[in-house]
Amino acid sequence: MSESSNSKVNPGGVLAGKVAVVTGASRGIGDAIARRFAMEGAKVVVSARTVDSGEHYLPGTINETVAAIRAAGGEALGVKADLASAADREQLIAAAEAEYGGVDILVNNAAITYFIPVEDFPEKRFRLMTDVQVWAPFELAQRVLPSMQERGSGWILNISSHAAIHPEKTLSGRGGTVYGMCKAALERFTTGLAQETYENGIGVNVISPGLVATPGVMHHKLINSENEDRVTPVEHMAEACLRLCHGDSKALTGRIDYADEVMREFDLQAAELI
């Protein structure tokens, strides 16, 4: 699929005037989503734990994402938030509302993951994973829903994984049970919330990326000769996310999709990111 040459902010784009909160937006998929939404005119609240370089072993920071958006003529606000913290979850939405008003789009992308077999999984890490991957999306949705319902419009997009699908019993591999459990819970939450908010003009969806060459994936050497032909460009993920955050919410809500499926269904071309 060819890439578009347009990489600048369009103030009259499909998200013009909308306020989007993107968690886990300092690198990888979250960074790409934040940039793509800004290109369509959204005011983007860029949230993550890493503010400056050197704070994390992986490259990418809030400041870098915000700077890239502003350099291209877009609007962005950086908000440091550890989503395992109740105070930070509250402060994130409060900061977005104080700066821009009500939130129109919430993208729950942040995650923390440990691959440990069930019998060895420490309670502290279990609670940390479920706090960030299940409770945080739930609470953030609770916090943005009142203003969305008042306006009669809004979008909530949850980033999942193929791990939500039940594994083959005959395949070897241990340690992914808790991660898969979290993503399965997130998907069931999504379809339930989509049903609850259907009449309120709010679209609630899930997108799973497949295998994307993010800094984390590259650091852990998860791409090899056996799967390199199945890598999804991060631009495709951002484009698919954009498509499920605008338009007729009743026609688009309650979806559980892979990025490439959305690209094919809507015949999308991935834009070059700012």
Task: For each feature predicted by the language model, list its residue ranges.
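Conserved Rossmann-fold SDR core element
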Residues: 37, 102-104, 187, 194-212, ...
